[in-house]
Amino acid sequence: MNSTSNSSLGNTFISKTLKEKSLTVQVLVGILLYVNGLMIFTFLKKETFRDTRYILFAQTLFVDSALMLFADLTLVGSAYELFIHIISCYIFCTVMALLSICSPVTLVAMCLERYVAICLPLRHASISSPKNTINGLLIIWGVSSVIPLFIFIVSFTYTPPNAMNSYVVCSNDVMFQVKWLAEMRALSQQLLFVIMLCIVGSTYIKIMVAAKSASAENKKSTYKGLRTVILHGLQLILGMMQLITPYIDILTLKVDIMLFINVKFSNFMLFWIFPRCLSPLVYGLRDKKFYNALKYYAFCGIYVCKKHKIKDSKTIRGAVSIAIY
């Protein structure tokens, strides 16, 4: 009887801890979604941001925002034990997997764009043409969808007929009932990460060589591009570190349930949320043209409201004076 009571109290405490931590995450996710949304709005409002560099940045903002939202919904669903249909969970996890690959692949494309702009300035306009930009976006989404779609097809095929109408608490683990599928995903993602890291590394080296041989007036912009590539590399490493978090979760779960919860939330903040904070830093704050436009639209609403209030107060005073007259 006492053991049952203690177990019930322990489960209640764990459930309460999960909900409290998930509420903390909501505040951070809400702030980041607002900032990213404001940046996307700024991009859409200004025609000057229609070149390849800013288009890729806007895609990064969209993908990161969508990924944060999907990951956050998964976190809330796990904390509050919300059940959904298993096929809906498969689709949900497939979209989230696609976004999680699309984000670093877009970062690699942004590094390549900086390489072309700095090392091949005479060919930058032709390579970064609108047609090539659209083709590049299609390639990014095509490459990003290969692994998730394969996993979805295999998971759907191996799901027993009696489980097709079941309801589950949605997480990535639901899709990996077949052991070899999880191993294949881990191997393919690690291979993709190595390829992307090699591309970013070679881009960095070539830009660094160009920076040393650049003239005095070009050195500043070249070194700025170099710092941008470094930040993208940091984003890539932090983002892809999520590949090892499942193994950390398994190890901590064997030690203590509370340690598992704390480590899981720390991993979520460090490898899911923090890398998505770097995109606004890289472009939103460091790029003067975008920063000025962002600042204008961030405070424009306040100024507009003040103007409307002044106009309304003048109208009311005028109406009162006419009535008295």
UniProtKB/Swiss-Prot annotation:
Q: Name one GO molecular function term.
A: protein homodimerization activity
Instruction: Give the membrane topology.
Output: Multi-pass membrane protein
Sorted alphabetically, the keyword list is:
Cell membrane, Cytoplasm, Disulfide bond, G-protein coupled receptor, Glycoprotein, Membrane, Olfaction, Receptor, Sensory transduction, Transducer, Transmembrane, Transmembrane helix
Q: Name one GO biological process term.
A: detection of chemical stimulus involved in sensory perception of smell
InterPro entries xrefs: GPCR1_Superfamily_Member, GPCR_Rhodpsn, GPCR_Rhodpsn_7TM
Q: In the UniProt record, which residues carry a glycan?
A: N2, N6
As recorded in UniProt, coiled-coil segments are none
Task: Look up keyword 4Fe-4S and say if it applies.
Answer: no
Q: Can you list the GO cellular component terms from the UniProt entry?
A: cytoplasm; intracellular membrane-bounded organelle; membrane; plasma membrane
**Main subcellular localization, coarse class?**
membrane
Q: For side Extracellular, which residue ranges?
A: 1-22, 76-91, 157-190, 249-267
- Pfam families referenced in this protein's UniProt entry, alphabetically: 7tm_1 (PF00001)
Disulfide-bonded cysteines: C89-C170
Q: Where in the cell is it found?
A: Cell membrane; Cytoplasm
Q: Which ranges of this chain reside in the Cytoplasmic compartment per its record?
A: 44-54, 113-135, 212-227, 286-325
What are the TM regions of this chain, as residue ranges? Answer: 23-43, 55-75, 92-112, 136-156, 191-211, 228-248, 268-285
Question: What's its job?
Answer: Probable olfactory receptor.
Q: How does it assemble?
A: Homodimer. Monomer.
**Which family would the database say this protein is a member of?**
Belongs to the G-protein coupled receptor 1 family.
This protein's name: Odorant receptor 131-2
Q: Which gene encodes it?
A: or131-2
